Amino acid sequence: MPKKGLHPQWYPEAKVICNGEVVMTVGSTKPELKVDVWSGNHPFFTGSQKIIDSEGRVEKFMRKYGMSGGKKAK
């Protein structure tokens, strides 16, 4: 016989909320799940890629410290 009060409350219709809008329902141990990103607005799933950093880290380092990036001639 299973013990009473051992398992958490199960919510079969828990709301997933993104930007104040209910985007889907899932089963969870919490009645509401607040998320910043979900498959409906993530660039990988929507196909709309955004370029966040157009300059690479190495180029930024080279520019910051005044290095040309080439090897010195002997």
UniProtKB/Swiss-Prot annotation:
<comment type="subunit">
    <text>Part of the 50S ribosomal subunit.</text>
</comment>
<keyword id="KW-0687">Ribonucleoprotein</keyword>
<dbReference type="InterPro" id="IPR042105">
    <property type="entry name" value="Ribosomal_bL31_sf"/>
</dbReference>
<dbReference type="InterPro" id="IPR027491">
    <property type="entry name" value="Ribosomal_bL31_A"/>
</dbReference>
<protein>
    <recommendedName>
        <fullName>Large ribosomal subunit protein bL31</fullName>
    </recommendedName>
</protein>
<keyword id="KW-0689">Ribosomal protein</keyword>
<dbReference type="GO" id="GO:0003735">
    <property type="term" value="F:structural constituent of ribosome"/>
</dbReference>
<dbReference type="GO" id="GO:0019843">
    <property type="term" value="F:rRNA binding"/>
</dbReference>
<dbReference type="GO" id="GO:0006412">
    <property type="term" value="P:translation"/>
</dbReference>
<dbReference type="GO" id="GO:1990904">
    <property type="term" value="C:ribonucleoprotein complex"/>
</dbReference>
<comment type="similarity">
    <text>Belongs to the bacterial ribosomal protein bL31 family. Type A subfamily.</text>
</comment>
<dbReference type="InterPro" id="IPR002150">
    <property type="entry name" value="Ribosomal_bL31"/>
</dbReference>
<dbReference type="InterPro" id="IPR034704">
    <property type="entry name" value="Ribosomal_bL28/bL31-like_sf"/>
</dbReference>
<dbReference type="GO" id="GO:0005840">
    <property type="term" value="C:ribosome"/>
</dbReference>
<dbReference type="Pfam" id="PF01197">
    <property type="entry name" value="Ribosomal_L31"/>
</dbReference>
<keyword id="KW-0694">RNA-binding</keyword>
<keyword id="KW-0699">rRNA-binding</keyword>
<comment type="function">
    <text>Binds the 23S rRNA.</text>
</comment>
